[in-house]
């Protein structure tokens, strides 16, 4: 049976096209982050965007940094911490990672000497360094894979803001640790030998310096609007609008570009609808949609997505959940499998 959907009427005064086509046209983009409040449709948006990018780019990687990891559910395909090809594509890959778990893997792969434990304690004394170093390991791994575009399906807003602060945290922390190399490296090597440990601190500091160089490069790329952008996803409610505004202000402080917003789950009752709840909900949504346009209408591409009567799962459904062609009043989206 074909699915039905109430869809958004065409509002007046779009200063910029209500479409993410601009992201496909910007060939220089390397990093695209998708984020927002929990439950607003970040994963569906990031998956759909990655599919559209795969049609115009040589290779695309979709990464989930949300510990909940919904990519596997969205594509109905199991993904892990290594990049795997998405079924039905030759150039789209996906992986699910947890920065803090990545750091734990790095610790467990080290030796068991007392010196190693001491250096871990020294490093972990820096606030946020555990997740940040996990982030660095992920970035180092991702950069080695040479994808032309990388889409991040991020965790809810608070986690995302912390994630985006990692490059700055790491740059400062690794700079301090690397500075210890010249001052205390020989002495720490001697102590390590006395303790019977086989750790060569010069090798450790070389690894830290190498990691710092990667993070410094990534940090510079994140602040370059030609290479990086962030796409907030929201629903037309007070809390979501408030959190989106807070997110955009934080992104501005981090000097991360943002010029697209996806407003998801919009409900527009048909003219002959007898559903009182639908009409009440529609009125509420219109209030906050209007506020969103007042805040962002002149400078942002605001993409309006309808509330669908079916959940978007599987590659076929994700391909139909387009963010490129603006929805028209009365348009029905059929997410059922092709016969």
Swiss-Prot record:
Positions of ATP binding: 37-44, 237, 264
One Pfam family of this chain: ArsA_ATPase
Major localisation: cytoplasm
GO biological process, one term: tail-anchored membrane protein insertion into ER membrane
Matches recorded under NCBIfam families: GET3_arsA_TRC40
Function text: ATPase required for the post-translational delivery of tail-anchored (TA) proteins to the endoplasmic reticulum. Recognizes and selectively binds the transmembrane domain of TA proteins in the cytosol. This complex then targets to the endoplasmic reticulum by membrane-bound receptors, where the tail-anchored protein is released for insertion. This process is regulated by ATP binding and hydrolysis. ATP binding drives the homodimer towards the closed dimer state, facilitating recognition of newly synthesized TA membrane proteins. ATP hydrolysis is required for insertion.
HAMAP family according to UniProt: Asna1_Get3
Family: Belongs to the arsA ATPase family.
Protein name as catalogued: ATPase GET3
């Amino acid at each position: 049976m074909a699915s039905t959907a109430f869809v958004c009427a065409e509002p007046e005064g779009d200063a910029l096209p209500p479409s993410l086509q601009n992201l496909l046209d910007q060939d220089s983009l390397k990093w695209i982050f998708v984020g927002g409040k929990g439950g607003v449709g970040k994963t569906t948006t990031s998956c759909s965007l990655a599919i559209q990018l795969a049609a115009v780019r040589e290779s695309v990687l979709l990464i989930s940094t949300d510990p909940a990891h919904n990519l596997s559910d969205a594509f109905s395909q199991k993904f892990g911490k290594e990049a795997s090809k998405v079924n039905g594509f030759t150039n789209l890959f996906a992986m699910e990672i947890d920065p803090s778990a990545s750091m734990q893997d790095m610790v467990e792969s080290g030796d068991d000497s007392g010196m190693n434990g001491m250096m871990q304690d020294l490093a972990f004394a820096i606030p946020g360094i555990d997740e940040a170093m996990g982030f660095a390991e992920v970035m180092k791994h991702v950069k080695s894979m040479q994808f032309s575009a990388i889409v991040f399906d991020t965790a809810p807003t608070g986690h995302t803001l912390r994630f985006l602060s990692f490059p700055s945290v790491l740059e400062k922390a690794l700079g301090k640790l690397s500075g210890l190399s010249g001052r205390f490296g020989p002495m720490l090597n001697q102590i390590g030998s006395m303790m019977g440990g086989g750790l060569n601190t010069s090798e450790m500091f070389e690894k830290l310096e190498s990691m710092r160089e990667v993070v410094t490069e990534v940090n510079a790329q994140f602040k370059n609007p030609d290479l990086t952008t962030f796409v907030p996803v929201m629903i037309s409610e007070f809390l979501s609008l408030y959190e989106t505004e807070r997110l955009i202000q934080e992104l501005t402080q981090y000097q991360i570009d943002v010029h697209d917003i996806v407003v998801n789950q919009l409900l527009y009752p048909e003219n002959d609808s007898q559903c009182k709840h639908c009409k009440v909900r529609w009125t509420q949504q219109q209030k906050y949609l209007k506020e969103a346009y007042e805040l962002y209408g002149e400078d942002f591409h605001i993409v309006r997505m309808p509330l669908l009567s079916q959940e978007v799962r599987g590659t076929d459904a994700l391909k139909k959940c387009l963010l490129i062609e603006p929805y028209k009043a009365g348009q029905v989206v059929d997410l059922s499998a092709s016969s």
